[in-house]
């Protein structure tokens, strides 16, 4: 029954994407709190400078040198460290969906009027404060992976996820929120470690989504971040 539901959801999602091809350009309005506890508005979208719009998609322009051609304007290209971590599989669990950039955008859009949805940056605080996806909240993976060591932070975070520990010590996930978790990139294991820690205590797999590409793929696609 669950697999049938996933299939129907996937078909629905494909039709939704087909009917709204411009969301990556029009964007999603997100209000988030800054490190100074102030409210800030972002239009989360794919940011493409005007001088980048007419570059032809050819081998010469995209895959020469390192890798963009020297004639491509600086505003249209970025460099990234690609030698860290270990590449991860596309799927962490058979009941857990893997998201791409468009799925995250649609999630953000619905999240603005649905308090049962959360975008989770599972990296440590210094990474989150430096740059993240607008609308994300920070819950470091270590609070869940080492819950006995970070007991106060773990229980506080758990309540924010809509779950709690009952008097008998059992977990209650009856009101658990739907989460999308991410970290630095497809080579980063912090969000998978948090996901596995959540699964270990019984968090419903169908309420966990993994944005595998993380910040590297997000920025690589020219998407809005909290660092201007």
Tell me the role of every PLM-derived stretch.
Residues 221-228:
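Active-site neighborhoods of enzymes that stabilize oxyanions during catalysis
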Residues 124-127, 143-146, 185-189, 214-218:
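Solvent-exposed loop/turn segments at secondary-structure junctions
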Residues 19-130:
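Flexible, polar/low-complexity N-terminal or interdomain linker segments that lie immediately upstream
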């Amino acid at each position: 029954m669950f697999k049938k539901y996933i299939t129907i959801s996937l078909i629905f999602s494909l039709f939704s994407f087909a009917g709204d091809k411009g969301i990556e350009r029009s964007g999603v309005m997100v209000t988030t709190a800054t490190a100074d506890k102030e409210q800030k508005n972002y239009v989360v979208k794919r940011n493409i400078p005007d001088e980048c719009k007419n570059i032809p998609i050819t081998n010469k322009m995209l895959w020469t040198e390192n890798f963009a051609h020297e004639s491509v304007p600086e505003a249209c290209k970025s460099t990234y460290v690609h030698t860290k971590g270990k590449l991860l599989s596309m799927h962490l669990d058979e009941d857990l969906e893997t998201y791409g950039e468009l799925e995250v955008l649609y999630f953000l859009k619905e999240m603005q009027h649905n308090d049962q949805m959360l975008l989770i940056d599972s990296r440590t605080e210094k990474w989150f404060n430096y740059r993240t996806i607008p609308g994300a909240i920070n819950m470091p993976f270590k609070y869940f992976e080492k819950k006995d060591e970070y007991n106060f932070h773990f229980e506080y975070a758990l309540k924010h996820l809509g779950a709690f520990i009952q008097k008998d010590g059992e977990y209650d996930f009856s009101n658990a929120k739907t989460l999308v978790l991410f970290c630095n990139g497809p080579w980063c294991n912090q969000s998978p470690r948090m996901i596995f820690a959540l699964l270990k205590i019984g968090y419903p797999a169908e309420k966990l989504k993994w944005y595998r590409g993380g910040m590297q793929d997000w920025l690589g696609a020219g998407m809005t971040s909290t660092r201007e």
